[in-house]
């Protein structure tokens, strides 16, 4: 037990450490001010989703079996929640401090976020008139009583809450929804570089709204609702699956609250009353000095857009030197494998390839998996055009992609209307693979182009996330990709492969086999190595095998952006394991697996993290890299990430993350890759 507890970290606590690293970017004064605002907003939205999904799941687990223990640290759901809450409170205090600091810094750029204590009588008169004309007609106040029950509070919406006293001394509760798309949230005070949030204005005018009452106390609140809902267990086979998902989204919006945030401290009795109405335990109440929703910072950024020193230097995805974009893309791939590295290189060659496939008379079919797609998608447009041109287009649209369900439902309708065959996913599994197969038949000869990536088919995120995309004409890979699509078409999963690693049946076991091979090399006194780049590591079976490898003398380097449940550097257990996390301008999203030392390396890129959900409960695909140049490129990229001493944090044997101690020349790996992409593009153009 003691050994396990010191080697493994609880998943939820590890995630909070990741979000702390996001908060550190907001705290970092070397980051441009407007970008710091972005990181603060990301920290907040990350925490929202954490409560909606992870804390919601823990609360559900307590209802099912309060003694249930997670398999790594043996913590019960209650123990996990008891550990989460003080950590969140601690991080939120840091968020409050850095927010105040950033607001002070904005004053130097003529942006003042004010309240009614900081304005003149003239400005107050303007705001009163503005409120009466623009806001008051649109709000819907409620007083809780016998004829008016406590209203349903929407997820992540802001409400003004007031304790009202009648003339005979009785207390009532008044509630006003503050969210309304018809009025601006960030209100400019004319003739001044000052702004006020609409919810603060509504809160100030609560006495005007509830005339005839004495306002004893008032605050802004925001509710976070559970979003952890199991689609598969609730599905009725008599229903159309797409219609079922539409209803499920509606149901999710009405799940139980898991958190309440307050903008002002309130009397304990009032908080207890709100908790009673919401059926929420008091421990899930959090007080914050920052606005309850930081999304308004993007409006501030728009105002300051011309002050370029407040933003990261502009970066544009560059032309890849591997492609001549004036020539047919598919013909170039047939000659040699190609790799695109986003966001450093442009997605254009892939988009052009799909458009070529839609128009090419020799293309007979296109098969593709879609998980998260842009709201305005050239990819979808090409697939629709291909179907309209008479090609066999089969698309698996994963309707269970969390928080993207509505977008995917709409795209699935459009694809179907165009004549595409649309598959909605699999029972019991999410299809998370990034797989595209194009089949051509020319003069009786069949050829294939297969694209396998680490990230979504999404033009927007390809500029914001680091991802990799392999395009190959390799027949062995194409035939196994075809097997994956055939299985998906029949509602099944692939059981065996020779080249691809395909979860849920033949990824985890093959990874473990490759770790075993490195253990054998180490035990024979030969150099042995494992390098892993991914978002998260939680799969206990793989982690236990990595511990065995470390004990055997295998050198293991891991670049893991988010959750890492394996603690490195523990004497006698994980001495040979190094873990780094990179949190920077772009979201690290690529997955790279490296097994073996120089001359015998096996290198893969994949859609899968080593999380139990990815290895056992999703359809994921990892592709081997057979092209020597691409293999070396990926290894060099991995080495560069390991050398990052600017945006990287190194995990120590206590599970804490610190800036690497080396005194080498500062290296920001993301900036390095972008400079490299610019140089490569210049060489192509010269």
Predicted regions, residues:
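Hydrophobic alpha/beta core scaffold segments
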Residues: 555-559
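N-terminal localization/anchoring segments of enzymes in phospholipid and broader phosphate metabolism
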Residues: 1-530, 548, 552, 564-686
């Amino acid at each position: 037990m003691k050994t396990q507890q010191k080697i493994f970290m609880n998943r939820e606590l590890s995630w909070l450490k990741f979000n702390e690293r996001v908060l550190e970017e907001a705290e970092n004064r070397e980051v441009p001010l407007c970008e710091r605002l972005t990181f603060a907003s990301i920290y907040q939205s990350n925490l929202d989703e954490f409560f909606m999904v992870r804390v919601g799941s823990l609360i559900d687990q307590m209802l099912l079996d309060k003694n249930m223990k997670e398999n790594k640290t043996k913590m019960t759901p209650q123990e996990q929640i008891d550990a989460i809450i003080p950590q969140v409170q601690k991080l939120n205090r840091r968020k409050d401090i850095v927010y105040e600091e950033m607001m002070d810094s904005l004053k130097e750029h003529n942006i003042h976020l004010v309240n009614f204590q900081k304005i003149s009588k003239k400005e107050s008169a303007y705001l009163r008139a503005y409120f009466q004309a623009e806001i008051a007609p649109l709000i819907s106040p409620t007083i809780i009583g016998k004829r008016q029950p406590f209203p349903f509070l929407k997820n992540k919406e802001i409400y003004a809450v007031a304790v009202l006293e009648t003339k005979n001394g009785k207390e009532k509760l008044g509630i006003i929804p503050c969210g309304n798309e018809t009025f601006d949230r960030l209100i400019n005070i004319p003739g001044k570089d000052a702004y006020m949030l609409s919810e603060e204005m509504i809160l100030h005018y609560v006495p005007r709204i509830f005339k005839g009452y004495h306002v004893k106390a008032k605050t802004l609140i925001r509710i976070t609702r559970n979003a952890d809902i199991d689609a598969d267990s609730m599905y009725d086979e008599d229903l159309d699956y797409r219609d079922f998902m539409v209803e499920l989204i509606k149901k999710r919006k009405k799940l139980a609250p898991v958190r309440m945030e307050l903008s002002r401290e309130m009397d304990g009795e009032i908080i207890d009353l709100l908790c009673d109405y919401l059926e929420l335990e008091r421990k899930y109440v959090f007080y914050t000095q920052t606005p309850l929703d930081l999304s308004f910072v993007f409006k501030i950024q728009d105002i300051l857009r011309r002050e370029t020193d407040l933003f990261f230097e502009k970066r544009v995805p560059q032309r890849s030197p591997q492609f001549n974009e004036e020539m047919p893309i598919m013909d170039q791939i047939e000659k040699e494998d190609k790799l695109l590295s986003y966001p450093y290189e442009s997605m254009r060659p892939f988009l052009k390839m799909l458009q070529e496939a839609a128009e090419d008379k020799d293309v007979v079919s296109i098969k593709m998996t879609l998980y998260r797609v842009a709201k305005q998608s050239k990819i979808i447009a090409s697939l629709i055009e291909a179907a309209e041109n008479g090609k066999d287009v089969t698309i698996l649209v994963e309707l269970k992609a969390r928080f993207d369900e509505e977008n995917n439902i709409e795209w699935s309708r459009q694809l179907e209307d165009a004549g595409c065959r649309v598959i909605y996913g699999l029972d019991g599994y999410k299809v998370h693979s990034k797989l595209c197969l194009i089949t051509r038949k020319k003069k009786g000869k069949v050829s294939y182009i297969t694209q396998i990536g680490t990230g979504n088919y999404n033009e927007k995120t390809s500029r914001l996330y680091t991802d990799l995309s392999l395009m190959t004409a390799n027949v062995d890979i194409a035939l196994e990709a075809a097997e994956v699509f055939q299985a998906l078409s029949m509602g099944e999963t692939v059981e065996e492969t020779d080249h691809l690693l395909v979860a849920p049946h033949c990824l985890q076991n093959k990874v473990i086999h490759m770790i075993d091979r490195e253990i054998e090399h180490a035990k024979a006194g030969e150099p042995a190595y494992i390098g892993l780049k991914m978002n998260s590591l939680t799969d206990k079976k793989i982690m236990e095998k990595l511990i065995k490898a470390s004990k055997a003398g295998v050198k293991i380097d891991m670049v893991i952006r988010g959750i890492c449940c394996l603690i490195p550097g523990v004497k006698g257990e994980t001495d040979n394991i190094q873990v780094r996390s990179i949190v920077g301008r772009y979201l690290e999203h690529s997955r790279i697996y490296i097994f073996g030392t120089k001359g015998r390396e096996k290198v893969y890129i994949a859609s899968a993290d080593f999380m139990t959900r990815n290895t056992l409960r999703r359809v994921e695909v990892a592709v081997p890299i057979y092209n020597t140049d691409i293999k070396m490129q990926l290894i060099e990229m991995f080495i560069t990430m390991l050398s990052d001493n600017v945006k990287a944090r190194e995990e120590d044997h206590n599970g804490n993350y610190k800036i690497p101690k080396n005194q080498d020349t500062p290296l920001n790996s993301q900036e390095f890759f972008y400079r490299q992409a610019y140089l490569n593009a210049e060489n192509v153009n010269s």
